[in-house]
Regions:
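Secretory targeting signals
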Residues: 26-40, 54-75, 114-181, 224-225, ...
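Helix-loop-helix units of permease transmembrane domains in multi-pass membrane transporters
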Residues: 88-122
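Terminal transmembrane helical anchor/hairpin motif
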Residues: 38-64, 192-195, 199-286
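Hydrophobic/aromatic residues in alpha-helical transmembrane segments
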Residues: 82-86, 134, 171-172, 188, ...
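A structural motif at transmembrane helix-loop-helix junctions in multipass membrane proteins
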Residues: 17, 160-201, 206
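Aromatic- and glycine-rich beta-strand/loop motifs that create alpha-glucan
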Residues: 1-27, 293
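Alpha-helical transmembrane segments of multi-pass membrane transport proteins
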Residues: 75-79, 91-92, 161-165, 280-281
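Membrane-interface capping segments at transmembrane-helix boundaries
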Residues: 39, 289-298
């Protein structure tokens, strides 16, 4: 049995599983709930009864509206989807004796791990791309706007960036699954990394910077007859630089930087974050491959 044959069997098992269907359904519902904000009346339209969000914002790019609506949901939920799909990729097979059964046949270890990787990555792309494609299609219908070529290009770029972000978390989850050989430990490790990156480190970074720089410094600025107290610009510059360096240790930060570039400009100007996510994914998958091939399965 070759790696491709293993991948086909694995992919079929994954997409037919209740876990996969439940994850895709929940992800889709969360994205759709985020898109509901696109059609809500904005503050600018409250005083104009006949105006709608579409009429007021008709000059804005469709892709920007959609990305703003689902951006937070994508940032929070995509790592969860990736972790849930990857935490038992290897450990589950070890626990169920599938790996031992396969190795009893004329199958090489590298065929097993490569086939599993291919099936997992394909199912991940399907699990992320399908809800996003459905959400984007509904957004076009809700807004009643025909997307331009620039809109389509930017949305496709965004889908690609989301896929790379998902791949990074999936690779990390597979690594935990391979190293621990235990699905519970693997899931716990993946969730802890996600919680630390998304919620804990941003708060901790502020406390760490306060310890390094001391309390905020303020300066008085004369504005006409009023005196305005503002935070010292040099202090804020150092604060922002240190925070960026600390948060750059997380995958979420690099995705958020790329997402902000797509929201603010016509495209990605700095590819550093994208390179980091791709390099991390490749390095982690290679590490998982090495550990699995060299480890004895009892």
């Amino acid at each position: 049995m070759k790696a491709l044959e293993i991948a086909k069997v694995e992919f079929g098992n994954i997409v037919r599983s209740n876990k996969f269907l439940a994850i895709v359904a929940i992800f889709t519902l969360m994205l759709l709930s985020g898109l509901c904000r696109v059609t809500e009346p904005s503050a600018a339209t409250l005083g104009v009864p006949s105006a709608t969000t579409h009429e007021v914002k008709s000059n804005e790019k469709l892709c920007v509206k959609v990305m703003e609506a689902i951006g937070y949901s994508v940032l929070i939920l995509v790592p969860v989807v990736a972790v849930m799909l990857g935490f038992d990729v290897i450990s589950g097979k070890v626990e169920k004796g599938i790996v031992r059964t396969l190795l009893a046949q004329p199958v090489f270890r590298d065929h097993i791990i490569v086939g599993t990787f291919v099936a997992g990555l394909t199912s991940l792309l399907v699990g992320v791309a399908m809800p996003l494609a459905l959400s984007l299609s509904l957004a076009v219908l809700l807004l009643g706007i025909t997307p331009s070529l620039a809109d389509i290009a930017l949305l496709v770029t965004y889908l690609g960036v989301v896929a790379v972000f998902a791949l990074a978390y999936y690779a990390l989850s597979v690594f935990f699954s391979t190293v621990t050989g235990n699905s519970v430990k693997s899931l716990a490790a993946g969730i802890l990394v996600w919680l630390f990156s998304s919620f804990m480190l941003p708060s901790l970074s502020t406390a760490i910077i306060r310890l390094l720089l001391g309390p905020p410094k303020f300066e008085q600025v004369q504005m006409g007859q009023m005196v305005v107290i503002k935070t010292d610009s040099e202090y804020m510059r150092k604060f922002t630089d240190l925070q960026s360096k600390i948060l750059s240790l997380t995958l979420d930060y690099h995705f958020r930087v790329i997402q902000d570039q797509l929201l603010l400009g016509p495209g990605i100007k700095d590819y550093t974050g994208l390179v980091v996510l791709i390099a991390f994914s490749l390095a982690t998958l290679i590490a998982s491959f090495t550990v699995f091939v060299k480890r004895e399965v009892r």
